[in-house]
Amino acid sequence: MALSIKQFVNFAGFVKDLKSFNFSVYAQYFGYINIIVCMALGIANLFHVNAVIAFGIVAIVQSLIILFVEVPFLLKICPLSENFINFIKNFETNGYRCIFYTLMAIVQWCSLALMVTSLIVVAICLTISAIFYAIAYFKNQEFQHTTNVIKNPTDDDFPHDAVVREML
């Protein structure tokens, strides 16, 4: 019996989140996409012979900061300074996250003044996240973490040790 991603991911919970019309959830999912986009395009823009390299480095740093903002579990398992943890904990509401993403988007939009590169995608994605958080803020929607996507190990259909032993 082979393990597949479907055994670990709760697709019904994902669909439930998408149907919730809670824009903070949409922004959080887009934040996960931002982590990948910022890292990938930040690395890709390190190969320019231009000042755009600085914005590529900033995009990489932004991806790491977004990772800690959107996945707060990492604050507990990674050895970090108290100052950094307190800085990240400032972004626990939709309003502060909207400001956070807006400022990061502005930085990436400024990169276009030097040279139009693939960092425009980073700027667009960060802007979309900021818009989603702004909509959630103005609609007075509660900020909630997406917990419905990964299956709980206590669920009946979660693959347990016996399945892994059978594979081996």
From Swiss-Prot:
- Protein's UniProt name: Golgi apparatus membrane protein TVP18
Q: What's this chain's function?
A: Golgi membrane protein involved in vesicular trafficking.
| Record family assignment | Belongs to the TVP18 family.
- Source species, domain of life: Eukaryota
Q: Which residues form a coiled coil?
A: none
Native species: Vanderwaltozyma polyspora (strain ATCC 22028 / DSM 70294 / BCRC 21397 / CBS 2163 / NBRC 10782 / NRRL Y-8283 / UCD 57-17)
Top-level taxonomy:
Eukaryota, Fungi, Dikarya, Ascomycota, Saccharomycotina
Query: GO cellular-component terms in the record?
Result: Golgi membrane
PANTHER family recorded? CALCIUM CHANNEL FLOWER HOMOLOG (PTHR13314:SF2)
Bilayer disposition of the protein = Multi-pass membrane protein
